[in-house]
Regions:
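Helix-loop-beta segment of a Rossmann-like dinucleotide-binding subdomain
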Residues: 25-26, 161-169, 204-242, 262-264, ...
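Glycine-rich FAD pyrophosphate-binding loop
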Residues: 102-123
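Dinucleotide-binding Rossmann-like beta1-alpha1 core, especially the glycine-rich loop
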Residues: 126-206, 360-363
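Short beta-strand to alpha-helix junction loop
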Residues: 135, 140-145, 172-180, 218-237, ...
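Flavin-dependent oxidoreductases
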Residues: 255-261, 266-376, 380-389, 493
Length: 598
């Protein structure tokens, strides 16, 4: 009772009108407030290890969540009775599908979007993290260590580029090197392999364009980079090749639950009757858990904006670079040259406690596997679970902040930017577990950073739990036709002249360049759309083989891509969308065009 009274006082200090209760050993908050930041603050104030989690049902006055549902409504999947229904086609759902495809199971993956990897998975920096910012007691720390070690083999099997580039924490002050014993001990506690101090001479061998103020760095070689959307697409295609049904434009609308068991799942494409449900629904994971009667957590979306620079600036980063979050590097560093003392510096920088409260790594200057440089992200709490908007103020702030890490970049180098949302819980940890109140569900929720890194390890546990549950009725047999390897679409830009010649002789479509910026051929586009998970949209093809991701952002190749997709699908160009059903590119022919039949 003392702990609950403490929570109640903390919440009421922020918002006296909020009702606080203990239900099923969860702290439940209800009420209505005028400020979203206050809603989030109340949720954080209610966190306690003595309870299962925080269910924050405080609403924002005047705000109503608008869910982006697909236009389609039919009975395509009505009456289906899969062994496993995976809800969510992000990195978590796709990796789980990949693992379950090894077994003789009827597995369905449903995704409400028009493609896999359209949520948080495609809207992040693609870092395979080392975990220096975590603590050993976190669930996500354990999965990070295991997942990081699995990436080389996983990406080789999926034929997806992975680079173990390492992560740098640059040093501005001489005294930062004195922290080596502490940082070294902390890295051992966190099981980070190979972390070491490097001086400026060695730093320049790895990062020739390193900022002038960097005296050295803490280097963590186990950090890496992957294209999160290409990996997710490969995993989904691989699962489909091995028998998993990937169902796009399919939204879960409700569930029928009796005696702690999910009996049926209602979607816009019919009612499904699964034996087991796996909840990997990203920012909607708490909504799905609530439908299933198994909710012990709340997702509060945290938006982050990332910036992509032109490839001509690709030499500015070969790893991911940042500084210690509590170290202040002055904007006029060329004048001060690191002469400020330790106490003065720490007073100007963020405290470690403040850094942890922001719940973000602070972003950085990051090398990508496609040889662009990525800047960001920032972190903004928002009420909308699908807020992908960007704003110039945030973009300028990110560029200004990261210019301290790499002073050779500028606004003129920016070619695009995008926003994504971290599906954070108030406990700031993953919820990966079997159902507590509902027996035939597995929760994979709260998967914010480092979710890309942890996905392979999380999927292993989910696979084990699924087999244990399904095996109670009958032994699950191995899929004898399982193929562990996936072949991705060849990328012309990465090939030698000899390799290109050989490929073009086999398939002349590879000799027709569609996207000049990224050197993407018609053959690549056709092979991408003819895959096990075909998606006839411009953005889906962009994620798979990159037409439109260069300097001109599709200004040259866009119309040709639309034409190729229309021809391949056998439809008019007006029917090809940029992304979802609502993102129309061409509405109709012009009057003159209609008359001349163009």
């Amino acid at each position: 009772m003392k702990e609950f009274a403490k929570i109640e006082r903390a919440v009421h200090a922020i918002a006296p009108s909020v009702n606080v209760s203990n239900e099923n050993n969860c702290v439940v908050l209800r009420g209505e407030l005028d400020n979203w930041d206050d809603v989030v603050r109340c949720g954080r104030a209610a966190v306690s290890k003595k309870y299962l989690g925080v269910i924050n049902d405080i609403t924002l006055r005047g705000y109503e969540q608008k869910v982006r549902l697909p236009k389609i409504n039919d009975k395509l999947y009505d009456g289906r009775k899969p062994d496993v229904l995976i809800v969510g086609g992000g990195i978590s759902g796709a990796t789980i599908a990949h693992e379950l495809s090894k077994w003789q199971l009827d597995v369905m993956l449903v995704e409400k979007g028009y493609d896999v990897a359209v949520g948080a998975t495609s809207r992040n920096d693609g870092c395979v993290h080392v975990g220096i910012d975590l603590t050993p007691k976190l669930v996500k720390h354990d999965y990070l260590i295991k997942g990081n070690a699995m990436y080389d083999e996983l990406c080789e099997d999926m034929d997806v580029k992975f680079e173990r580039t390492g992560h740098m924490m640059l040093m501005y002050y001489k005294w930062e090197r004195l922290l080596m014993p502490i940082v070294g001990l902390w890295s051992k506690i966190l099981k980070i392999k190979g972390m070491r101090y490097i001086d400026r001479k060695e730093l320049l061998k790895i990062e020739p364009e390193a900022v002038e103020w960097a005296r050295g760095a803490y280097y963590m070689p186990t950090g890496g980079m992957v294209s999160p959307y290409k990996l997710t697409v490969a995993l989904a295609e691989h699962a489909a090749e091995n028998g998993v049904h990937v169902c796009l434009n399919t939204a879960v609308l409700g569930m029928k639950v009796e005696d702690g068991e999910i009996k049926s799942v209602e979607t816009n494409r019919g009612t499904i009757y699964p034996r087991l449900v796996i909840n990997a629904a990203g920012t909607y994971a708490d909504v799905i858990a609530d439908m299933a009667g198994d909710r012990t957590f709340t997702i509060h979306p945290r938006k982050g904006i990332d910036i992509i620079l032109d490839k001509k600036k690709g030499n500015l980063a070969h790893t991911s670079m940042s500084k210690m979050p509590f170290v202040h590097v002055p904007a006029n560093w060329k004048e001060t040259k690191g002469k400020e003392g330790l106490l003065k510096t720490l007073m100007k920088g963020k405290s470690l406690n403040e850094t942890q409260k922001t719940h973000t790594k602070g972003g950085g200057v990051i090398h990508t596997v496609d040889n662009n440089v990525l800047l960001g992200p920032n972190a903004i709490e928002v009420p909308d679970r699908e807020d992908f908007t960007t704003d110039m103020e945030s973009i300028q702030d990110i560029v200004t902040k990261q210019k301290i890490i790499q002073d050779k970049l500028g606004m003129g180098d920016v070619i695009t930017y995008f926003a994504g949302e971290r599906p954070a819980t108030y406990e700031e940890d993953f919820v990966v577990r079997r159902g507590i109140f509902t027996k035939n569900i597995i929760e994979v929720a709260g998967i914010q950073s480092p979710g890309i890194t942890t996905a392979p390890a999380v999927a292993k546990d989910v696979e084990r739990w699924a087999l244990m549950f399904l095996g109670k009725q009958e032994k699950v047999k191995v899929n004898e036709n399982y193929n562990p390897k996936h072949k991705s679409v060849p990328h012309l830009a990465d090939m030698s002249e000899e390799e290109r010649d050989e490929l073009i002789k086999k398939n002349p479509a590879y000799g027709e360049i569609v996207c000049r910026c990224e050197e993407i051929s018609k053959g690549e586009i056709l092979d991408a759309v003819r895959s096990a998970v075909p998606v006839y949209t411009v953005d889906a093809i962009k994620r798979r083989v990159r037409p439109g991701m260069g300097r001109c952002q599709g200004g040259f190749c866009g119309p040709t891509v639309v034409k190729i997709l229309a021809e391949e699908k056998g439809c008019s160009v007006e029917e090809i969308t940029k992304g979802n059903d609502y993102s129309v590119i061409l509405y109709n022919k012009t009057k003159k065009g209609a008359e001349t039949n163009v």
